[in-house]
């Protein structure tokens, strides 16, 4: 059927105000209000029922989490509004291949639970840079990696999530983009700054349920509207806009026609927009950084009761990662069928009219579907879903970023900072992070032909591979030492950042107006660039390590895969830093004893709300401290549960292979 019957003039020329009017009904507003009340209630319950008055309680939820909130939180931390907007947008523009990004994670979560987390737990660490400090000694890698991780959070995660959430609110409520951002962040910051990791994980679990429920309903509506799966395939290939020329310029056919390989995940290695070797190897490298070495993800696993709960949480997350292809990518493609003129626009003036940016409007595919297709009440639910995904991602990132700053950077500046000072510093840092992220939003708006998901993946391809290389070699190659790891990170970063800056300087261009960036720099697909950068970093690390002094095994017990089960006592390379930490804790005790004066009611309420009332239990003896440390670094599992999670892990890998093969 010709696509023109699927783009009614009324919707094609709809202004945001009409969409805004649609939300103005009792059912939608009630659902949104109820949603916010429930989320705040869960956040407040977690806030008052968990220990947030210590660094371990605020940042690691006291290592008491069971598998299902961990699985839900892993999924919710990963799936932000950037996925709803970005995956659906790239799906509308180029077909199902972008779903391969999600399915790749099925393999990586197994690696995370079975290989990486056991090492991190045995090392007894809270942050990823802290692991590298124990593994290599010295402080420069730890500080460098903390700063780089924070830069990545700002450039990719926070900016993209804020931008995509604001697109949705702008379309649905008619609010100014930056006012929408401000309101969102105010609510998000409130319970992250006050609540700590337990509040984040419990609200994530609630929001995962809402997110899946809402997107299942929308997918059902979308497929019903388009006439089922086979009609969807036919109609998508015919979803071509009618306006394809302006002035004396006619748009090239490939700019507005759906790709011939739209329904294949694996695409041509040279001409494909997502070449299959890049999707298999390049994406796995980026995913290794994201899933196995990134603070946001690993922190959830480190909060688990024991290893079986870690693995079960990873499996649960893996199964849920099957869904975005059907709940986000395909609805985005259906949005192109139903609202072709708007979503598939190619003429710059038309695009600017519909979504305020000249490079393309595919980013509004999912929000448009929600606003135009859903009945009253359900539309409010879907707006709540978008807010849920945005806020769950932001809360996760804010909590993890403040952990990195507090534990890895602030403690270097203020070596004798009290626990209370660390808690306040972490919370204040979140406010700085928010400000910088908002300033970056306009750049996100115009990058990668207006395709948000491509922007996120390209930035991680330029900055992530060196980190992945260092962690991989740190765990599997005990010969690697500090000079090798440090210079590998620095050289890898310089190569990646030079590509990133060049691309931003020239602009990524669009199908209509290609970028003038030199082919030798920007002509290499970002997934291929990730492979090249990863290999160069590994060569540099190994070469420098082999020419410099190795680290003795006594410093590496339980920090490398080959020495993971050793029972000998490890002499940490950062033992001096540990002494400073102990001295700080002793000073803290003296400090708290000295300041036991009676506080007023207002001060007590303030401390309780912000989690600054350190719950003081009886002081532990040295033997009790040693037993506690043993519990925190224990990776043992009951035989039955180990078998159950192992069998499920194998099934998950088989499902991943089947999905890739079926849609190849």
Curated annotation (Swiss-Prot):
Protein's UniProt name: Sodium/glucose cotransporter 1
Binding site for D-glucose: 457
Function: Electrogenic Na(+)-coupled sugar symporter that actively transports D-glucose or D-galactose at the plasma membrane, with a Na(+) to sugar coupling ratio of 2:1. Transporter activity is driven by a transmembrane Na(+) electrochemical gradient set by the Na(+)/K(+) pump. Has a primary role in the transport of dietary monosaccharides from enterocytes to blood. Responsible for the absorption of D-glucose or D-galactose across the apical brush-border membrane of enterocytes, whereas basolateral exit is provided by GLUT2.
The species this protein was found in: Ovis aries (Sheep)
Subcellular location, principal: membrane
Alphabetically ordered keywords of this record: Cell membrane, Disulfide bond, Glycoprotein, Ion transport, Membrane, Sodium, Sodium transport, Sugar transport, Symport, Transmembrane, Transmembrane helix, Transport
This protein's domain notes: The cholesterol-binding site is formed by transmembrane helices TM1, TM7 and TM13.
Topological category with respect to the lipid bilayer: Multi-pass membrane protein
Pfam families per UniProt: SSF
Residue runs in coiled coils: none
Sites annotated Involved in sugar-binding/transport and inhibitor binding: 460
GO terms classed as biological process: D-glucose import across plasma membrane; intestinal D-glucose absorption; renal D-glucose absorption; sodium ion import across plasma membrane; transepithelial water transport; transport across blood-brain barrier
Activity regulation details: Enhanced by the interaction with PDZK1IP1/MAP17; but unlike SLC5A2/SGLT2, PDZK1IP1 is not essential for SLC5A1 transporter activity. Possibly modulated by cholesterol binding.
Site (Implicated in sodium coupling): 43, 300
Disulfide bridge partners, by residue number: 255-511, 255-610, 345-351, 355-361, 517-522
Post-translational modification: N-glycosylation is not necessary for the cotransporter function.
Segments passing through the bilayer: 25-47, 67-90, 96-117, 140-169, 177-193, 203-221, 276-295, 310-331, 376-406, 423-444, 452-477, 482-504, 526-547, 645-662
